[in-house]
Amino acid sequence: MAFTRIHSFLASAGNTSMYKRVWRFWYPLMTHKLGTDEIMFINWAYEEDPPMALPLEASDEPNRAHINLYHRTATQVNLSGKRILEVSCGHGGGASYLTRALHPASYTGLDLNPAGIKLCQKRHQLPGLEFVRGDAENLPFDNESFDVVINIEASHCYPHFPRFLAEVVRVLRPGGHLAYADLRPSNKVGEWEVDFANSRLQQLSQREINAEVLRGIASNSQKSRDLVDRHLPAFLRFAGREFIGVQGTQLSRYLEGGELSYRMYSFAKD
């Protein structure tokens, strides 16, 4: 996702129902338009210096830069043998990779986008992996159901972020963890940090990853641009390039200039 002029306009809607209604339209549109067999990840990319060089299956190689972000975020905690919930799982590529690579006991991917969930259920069929439709601010699970919650590049779309954090706390078992990565306008980082401080989550780590995200976007840029040009009509291509992450777009200038802060966190439930 990108915080672009579109996001700036939507931000004026604040915590209104209009905000969520826009995303309920936008994500299914992108699922239908962006070639569902090609785009299993809708997060931006990530690469370190020197490169991470993860050992990947041949089928995962085209998505290396996207997988890097999932791997680095998720491995802030130990997933092996744990009950995992990913909130806003997109097209399920990250859920599939983490299930295969890190061996959780179970992995549940949740998303508000019905077209995305239908795609996930068709495309990613693995033992212990399931996908359900649901709202990040009203999770359809019992208290203390999960050991780890994963949330990557999604919460900036939630109109009531503190409500999401409260739901994370509710569904985590005592001692459970949140592995999290997202972005905010730099002038909103203080509010972001206050929301974390007011939750029942203890911050274990935090770092800004603008440089790594920009490096990943650069490595993926031509592939992403070609994908948008193939599948979107001309009037949607500007928004599509911002959404998917292409070098030289407004998002990359915001990241380079520091107007956006992309951060990775880990938290534990008190």
From Swiss-Prot:
GO terms for biological process: lipid metabolic process; methylation. It is an enzyme of class 2 (transferase). SUPFAM superfamilies: S-adenosyl-L-methionine-dependent methyltransferases (SSF53335). InterPro entries: Methyltransf_11, Methyltransf_Superfamily, PthPhpthDimycoMt, SAM-dependent_MTases_sf. Its EC number is 2.1.1.-. It comes from the Bacteria. Keywords: Lipid biosynthesis, Lipid metabolism, Methyltransferase, Transferase. It holds the Pfam family Methyltransf_11. One of its GO terms (molecular function) is S-adenosylmethionine-dependent methyltransferase activity. Catalyzes the methylation of the lipid moiety of the intermediate compounds phthiotriol and glycosylated phenolphthiotriol dimycoserosates to form phthiocerol dimycocerosates (DIM A) and glycosylated phenolphthiocerol dimycocerosates (PGL). Belongs to the methyltransferase superfamily. Phthiotriol/phenolphthiotriol dimycocerosates methyltransferase family. PANTHER family: METHYLTRANSFERASE, N6-ADENOSINE-METHYLTRANSFERASE TMT1A. This is Phthiotriol/phenolphthiotriol dimycocerosates methyltransferase. The lineage of its organism: Bacteria, Bacillati, Actinomycetota, Actinomycetes, Mycobacteriales.
